[in-house]
Amino acid sequence: MLLVTGGAGFIGSNLVAALNDVAVCDFLGSDGKWRNLAKRQLADVVPPTELSAWLEDRKLDAVIHMGAISETIATDGDLVIETNFRFSSRLLDWCTVHATPFIYVSSAATYGEGDQGFVDDASIDALKRLRPMNLYGWSKHLFDLLILERLAKRREYAAAIGGPEVLQRFRSKRIPQGLDDGCVSAPVR
């Protein structure tokens, strides 16, 4: 079974549509987001607040982590850091302990104004030079750095989770029925 966090959102639900034996971790809310999943066959739908308990004694083939507060105008720093950094860190810890491949979706918001360019250089030094312009970009940037620092400190980590790890950076501008400016990605080793 695969777990897709953020699987009820626009991009996540389209990914889920292409997968089999998948569980979704997301807040459905009251704005009709459930409709994105209504035509899908799902193994489960789990609220993020219940994920830790759900993961107990569970074996997953992989985790695709897309869940985040993605509004670039978000202002609640505590909520954004809890959701985008701390929750992500706990999920990465679980994947590490259970040798589960972890695919993480970052954001092009980590580039900031682009004074360092928009080319994916997965080195820690290159990431440390990036200056995100908003809280959302900064929260994703912190997690990008955490992953790369763990990989640098513990080379066996990549083998333990069945690598290669993949870092995807999506641009935040979306339109109904499609992305108008795509994504960039780089394998992280």
Pin down the residues of each PLM region.
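Glycine/proline-rich active-site loop of Rossmann-fold NAD(P)-dependent oxidoreductases
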Residues: H141, R154-R155, V166-G182, R189
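SDR active-site strand-loop-helix element
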Residues: T5, C25, V63-G67, F102-A108, ...
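Rossmann-fold NAD(P)-dependent oxidoreductase module
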Residues: N14, A18, W94, L146
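Catalytic helix-loop patch of NAD(P)-dependent Rossmann-fold dehydrogenases
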Residues: E82, R86, R90, V97, ...
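N-terminal Rossmann/SDR dinucleotide-binding element
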Residues: M1-A62
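Conserved sequence/active-site signature of Rossmann-fold short-chain dehydrogenase/reductase
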Residues: S30, T110-Y111, V166-R169
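NAD(P)H-binding glycine-rich loop region in Rossmannoid oxidoreductase-like domains
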Residues: K39, P48-T83, G112
